[in-house]
């Protein structure tokens, strides 16, 4: 793969990103075959020992050539030689070609994205989910509104082709990609839609993920330069308004921003407090200003994406939340900004007086009620939080039962260790402790009291290791009880978070601001 990437870098720089010949490189499909057999567990038509011997690279070449000579046929492998498909179904060669169409543009896309981010400290990408929260902890308290954006998954195939045309000048490759996007609806296109393509499909194929990431990157690529130019723009000169002092003081904080993709100049208040974070299809833009200003930002962002990227993002998909009054959900947390009031005595030379000092604090909270609902859905408790035994696990050994409950609690506590309130987490621990004891009691046909006497301190103590407990206790002694610990080794959402997030995120969206 490294050799393929080196060849891709040299070829792209010399031939101006002509990628179609790479589809006929045999090394590419050797990688695709390894990926196919490592991923697929249901491939049974032939023995693994002879699988690589029966692969025909000539069939792949003919399939790619026929893709550009189709007459409306959905499957481009119908006319292939049936003898060369012995031991393989047509979906195997179809997946190989799709893998090639995915792997080839990944190389110039990675080079292009890396080159565009050089010297731009405002735009950083992290693997850890929790790396987002320290940024929000520092920046969001200085903002008073957020734009909660839900990026749609559906778009037209031609929009994706036009997106790739901005950085790929290879017409044959684009024709092949267009054919795949229009015809392979069973892999990356929703079955109940005729014209729209589902970018992030349920199968999460490599091609659908690449299409989603590249399209989202294109939509975000101009945000940082736009905001950077906006925040560093000079104020409007006001020498001609010398006699109108009040108007001068107001207009010096106004800038006029024009862009080559916009037909009109945009007037905004000059305020550099704009922060942007994204995880998958959720994007958060934190702003400081009035409600009218935030509505203007939503209007102009919607028009900008529609005119330039054909991203039909309806205004009701961009929620406006006021941080001082509302909380919003992001990555399984309920986030808000809390106002803290402290009494301060100010001493002057001749007198002293008492005043109130108001500070803003970022307040992430674990949604205990929603997590209990997820546990109820997984049959660990009922909807009110009363524990239920897991009868399906009674056939396992005692260590396996303990390890499974330990793993569930460890993941919950590890993920929500940054919560400002730990009471809900210990309630979750109590809910999981009783199902563990009840499951062991059902297995041994005894009472819960007997199980506790038998296992003693080993029951449900593996989930809170001594080293982690000592770290947490030492941190609590030296710091405030509301200080948070963000673990940088978390790279995906908690499974319980995914269950309630899907229900919360894909409900019917309101037509008005929250």
From Swiss-Prot:
Superkingdom as given in the UniProt entry: Eukaryota
GO MF: RNA binding
Gene field: matK
Listed name of the protein: Maturase K
Assigned keywords, A-Z: Chloroplast, mRNA processing, Plastid, RNA-binding, tRNA processing
Major subcellular location class: plastid
Keyword Plastid: yes
Pfam families, per the entry: Intron_maturas2, MatK_N
Similarity annotation: Belongs to the intron maturase 2 family. MatK subfamily.
Function recorded in the entry: Usually encoded in the trnK tRNA gene intron. Probably assists in splicing its own and other chloroplast group II introns.
GO cellular component, one term: chloroplast
Location in the cell: Plastid, Chloroplast
GO biological process, one term: mRNA processing
């Amino acid at each position: 793969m490294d050799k393929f990437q080196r060849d891709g870098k040299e070829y792209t720089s010399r031939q101006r990103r002509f990628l179609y010949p790479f589809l006929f490189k045999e090394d590419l499909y050797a990688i695709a075959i390894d990926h196919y057999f490592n991923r697929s567990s249901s491939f049974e038509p032939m023995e693994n020992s002879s699988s690589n011997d029966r692969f025909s690279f000539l069939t792949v070449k003919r399939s790619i050539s026929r893709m550009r000579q189709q007459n409306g046929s959905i499957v481009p492998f119908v006319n292939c030689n049936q003898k060369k498909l012995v031991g393989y179904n047509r979906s195997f060669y179809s997946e190989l070609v799709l893998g090639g169409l995915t792997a080839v543009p990944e190389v110039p896309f990675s080079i292009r994205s890396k080159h565009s981010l050089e010297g731009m400290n405002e735009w950083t990408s992290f693997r850890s989910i929790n790396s987002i929260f320290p940024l929000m902890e520092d920046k969001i308290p200085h903002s008073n509104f957020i734009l909660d954006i839900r990026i749609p998954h559906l778009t037209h195939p031609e929009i994706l082709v036009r997106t790739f045309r901005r950085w790929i000048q290879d017409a044959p490759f684009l024709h092949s990609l267009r054919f795949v996007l229009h015809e392979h609806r069973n892999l990356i296109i929703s079955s109940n839609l005729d014209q729209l393509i589902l970018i992030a499909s349920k199968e999460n194929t490599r091609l659908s993920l690449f299409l989603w990431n590249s399209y989202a990157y294109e939509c975000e690529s101009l945000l940082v330069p736009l905001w950077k130019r906006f925040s560093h723009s000079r104020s409007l000169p006001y020498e001609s308004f010398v006699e109108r002092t009040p108007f001068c003081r107001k207009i010096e904080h106004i800038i006029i921003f024009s862009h080559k993709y916009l037909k009109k100049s945009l007037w905004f208040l000059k305020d550099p407090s704009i922060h942007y974070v994204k995880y998958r299809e959720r994007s958060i833009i934190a702003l400081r200003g009035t409600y009218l200003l935030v509505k203007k930002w939503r209007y102009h962002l919607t028009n900008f994406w529609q005119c330039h990227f054909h991203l039909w993002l309806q205004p009701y998909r961009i929620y406006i939340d006021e941080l001082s009054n509302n909380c919003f959900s992001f990555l399984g947390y309920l986030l808000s900004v809390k106002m803290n009031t402290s009494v301060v005595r100010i001493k002057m030379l001749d007198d002293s007086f008492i005043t109130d000092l108001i500070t803003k604090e970022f307040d992430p909270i674990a949604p205990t009620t929603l997590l209990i609902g997820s546990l109820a859905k997984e049959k660990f408790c009922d909807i009110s939080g009363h524990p239920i035994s897991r009868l399906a696990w009674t056939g396992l050994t005692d260590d396996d039962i303990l390890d499974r409950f330990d793993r569930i609690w460890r993941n919950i506590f590890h993920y929500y260790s940054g919560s400002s309130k730990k009471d809900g987490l210990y309630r979750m621990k109590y809910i999981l402790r009783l199902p563990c004891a009840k499951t062991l009691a059902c297995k041994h046909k005894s009472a819960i009291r007997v199980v506790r006497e038998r296992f003693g301190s080993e029951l449900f103590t593996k989930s809170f290791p001594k080293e982690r407990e000592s770290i947490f206790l030492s941190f609590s002694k030296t710091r405030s009880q509301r200080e948070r610990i963000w673990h940088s080794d978390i790279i995906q959402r908690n499974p319980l978070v995914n269950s309630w997030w899907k229900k919360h995120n894909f409900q019917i969206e309101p037509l008005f601001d929250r």
